[in-house]
Amino acid sequence: MNKLPILIFMLLVCSMFISSDCQKHTDIKCSSSSSCYEPCRGVTGRAHGKCMNGRCTCYY
């Protein structure tokens, strides 16, 4: 039996869990993604973030 489809499925599921843990939703209001850089540096230690629906989402 070919185990390649099972391996690909498991890799996909694991990568989905890892990517969902890499973002932090905040209550910091924003108008553009550039206004999230400094607040995200305080939350995650990195200046990676974007403005989504008027709130900053920070990434690790």
Swiss-Prot record:
Expressed by the venom gland. The record marks 59 as: Aromatic residue of the functional dyad. The record marks 50 as: Basic residue of the functional dyad. Disulfide bonds join 30-51, 36-56, 40-58. One of its GO terms (cellular component) is extracellular region. GO terms for molecular function: ion channel inhibitor activity; potassium channel regulator activity; toxin activity. It is found in: Secreted. It comes from the Eukaryota. Residues 1-22 form the signal peptide. Keywords: Disulfide bond, Ion channel impairing toxin, Neurotoxin, Potassium channel impairing toxin, Secreted, Signal, Toxin, Voltage-gated potassium channel impairing toxin. Belongs to the short scorpion toxin superfamily. Potassium channel inhibitor family. Alpha-KTx 12 subfamily. Has the structural arrangement of an alpha-helix connected to antiparallel beta-sheets by disulfide bonds (CS-alpha/beta). This recombinant toxin inhibits the mammalian voltage-gated potassium channels Kv1.3/KCNA3 (IC(50)=28 nM). Kv1.1/KCNA1 and Kv1.2/KCNA2 potassium channels are also weakly inhibited (IC(50)=1.73 uM and IC(50)=12.63 uM, respectively). This is Potassium channel toxin alpha-KTx 12.5. It comes from Lychas mucronatus (Chinese swimming scorpion).
